[in-house]
Every structure is written in structure tokens, then in C-alpha cells.
A protein has these predicted regions:
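Intrinsically disordered, low-complexity and often Lys/Arg-enriched segments
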Residues: 1-10, 247-251
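Conserved P-loop
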Residues: 84-162, 211
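Non-catalytic alpha-helical coupling and interface elements of nucleotide-dependent molecular machines
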Residues: 17, 29-32, 47-51, 81, ...
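Interdomain "pre-motor" coupling segment immediately N-terminal to P-loop NTPase/helicase cores
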Residues: 9, 17-69
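Solvent-exposed alpha-helical segments within well-ordered globular domains of core cellular machineries
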Residues: 6, 10-13, 22-25, 40-44, ...
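Clamp-loader machinery-focused feature within the broader ASCE/P-loop NTPase space
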Residues: 52, 57-91, 99
Length: 251
């Protein structure tokens, strides 16, 4: 590497221009071979830097989202679940519900694809550079109860309120103690008409009193979550079973 190239690389490092620092020499050589103008060369350098920063930003948001696994909507086999409205799911992935702070409720039996769809929507939001956090209902409640115990609940609630999309998975598998239910309601109520939330549940709404045993609190939770909500029913037949069966038939 020449002294001039080394100096440019050092300047790029100081300015945190990672892509330009690694690409300027090869792009300069290519520009010389193709007889490109200085402006063309500069544009290529800057475009590469922008694309690299966007890629790293999305990667960071995906990491911060704490997704259980990387399952995109492109991987979801809608043909195996024709009753799930593919067009509605793809429309949601465009992100309008995020701008309008509308809830999304995925309701269906275990194994029907709720978590996959929720994860896919979360990934789509990360690609749109939104701050996303994925959690199970049980894990979220445990965090809130612990925060209340060590007197850091206000800070915890502010942290969750700052996220542009929360995915609460597996609501309904276990009943919630009244204190836990009230804390979860605080998170949900704080987001009403302010920020989006996705909830997956195996229970129809008529059975939510099994989870929120306080009738008044149950009604309040349902009111917040169903107002202006996108409600997607994933059915009762296992998506995982049908997909596995389909793969075996192809073998």
C-alpha cells in the first residue's frame, strides 16, 4: 500500500467510513480501467458507504430485537395454510400499521404459524429500521415483576415504551397472577394509539378471563388490544405438522 493510500485509509478510519476505507483502492482501479469520471467514482464510493451503513443498521436492529429465530415471511408456506390471508400479512409487512400504531393479533391453536408470522413481521419492521423487541408473555411479566421488586419499574416501563414495535408471544398459555396481569396491562395501555404491538395467543377472546382473572382488567386489556386491531386467525390445524408431512411426501 502506498503512503497516499495508507493516509486515505487512516482518514477513513478516523471518520468511521468503513466501506470507503476498504473499497476506495479497488474502485479507483476499476474507475481507471473503465475511464469513469471523478464524480462517478465518488458516487460509487458514497453509495457503497450508504448501503453498508444501512446493512449494519438492520443487522443491529435484528440483534437487538431478540428474535427466537430468523424466520421471514418469505419462508412461510401460505399454500399449507390457505385460510391465513397472505395478502393481509404481506400488506402488514409494508409497515402501515406501525405508522398508525395499530395492534396485530394472531389467534390460533399451537403450531398454526403464529410465532413464525409474528417473527416475519418483526423482521420486516427491522428492515424498515424500526426498533423492535420480541418477548414471550411469561418473560415480559417476569421482567416487570422483578423490576417492581427492585424498584426499577418506572425505568423498565420507559424502556419498553421507547420501542416502536413489541411482539408479545404465547399470551394465554398460563394464567397470570393479578399483580403480573396489572403490570402487563401497563405496558399494553402505554402503547395504545402511540406504538404498535403484535400479540400471539392460543385463546379466543372469550377465554381470556382464564389469563386475566380480574374481569375489569380483562375487559380493559381487550379494549386496548382490539381497538383498530388487525386480527388474524391462524386456525386449529398445525402448520408445522402439515409442512413436515408435505416434505416427507416429496422425499
Amino acid at each position: 500500500m502506498s503512503m497516499q493510500a495508507a493516509s486515505i485509509a487512516q482518514h477513513c478510519k478516523s471518520l468511521r467510513l468503513a466501506s470507503i476505507g476498504t473499497q476506495f483502492a479497488s474502485l479507483a482501479e476499476e474507475a481507471g480501467k473503465q475511464n469513469h469520471s471523478h464524480l462517478h467514482y465518488l458516487e460509487a464510493l458514497l453509495q457503497g458507504e450508504v448501503e453498508d451503513r444501512e446493512r449494519r443498521s438492520i443487522e443491529l436492529r435484528l440483534k437487538d430485537a431478540h428474535l427466537p429465530r430468523m424466520k421471514t415471511l418469505e419462508e412461510f408456506d401460505f399454500a399449507q395454510s390457505p385460510h391465513i390471508p397472505a395478502a393481509r400479512i404481506r400488506a402488514l409487512a409494508e409497515g402501515g400499521y406501525l405508522q398508525r400504531a395499530e395492534p396485530v393479533l394472531l389467534v390460533g391453536e399451537p403450531g398454526t404459524g403464529k410465532t413464525h408470522l409474528a417473527t416475519g413481521l418483526a423482521i420486516a419492521a427491522c428492515r424498515q429500521r424500526k426498533r423492535v423487541r420480541f418477548t414471550t408473555a411469561a418473560a415480559l411479566v417476569n421482567q416487570l415483576v422483578e423490576a417492581q421488586r427492585d424498584q426499577s419499574l418506572t425505568r423498565m416501563l420507559k424502556r419498553w415504551a421507547s420501542v416502536e414495535l413489541i411482539v408479545i408471544d404465547e399470551l394465554g398459555y398460563v394464567p397470570l397472577a393479578e399483580v403480573a396481569a396489572e403490570l402487563l396491562f401497563q405496558v399494553i395501555a402505554e402503547r395504545a394509539e402511540k406504538a404498535a404491538v403484535i400479540v400471539t395467543t392460543n385463546l379466543p377472546f372469550s377465554e381470556w378471563p382464564q389469563v386475566f382473572t380480574n374481569a375489569r382488567l380483562c375487559k380493559a386489556v381487550l379494549d386496548r388490544l382490539t381497538d383498530q386491531a388487525h386480527i388474524i386467525e391462524t386456525g386449529a390445524e398445525s402448520y408445522r405438522f402439515r409442512r413436515t408431512l408435505g416434505k416427507k411426501r416429496k422425499m
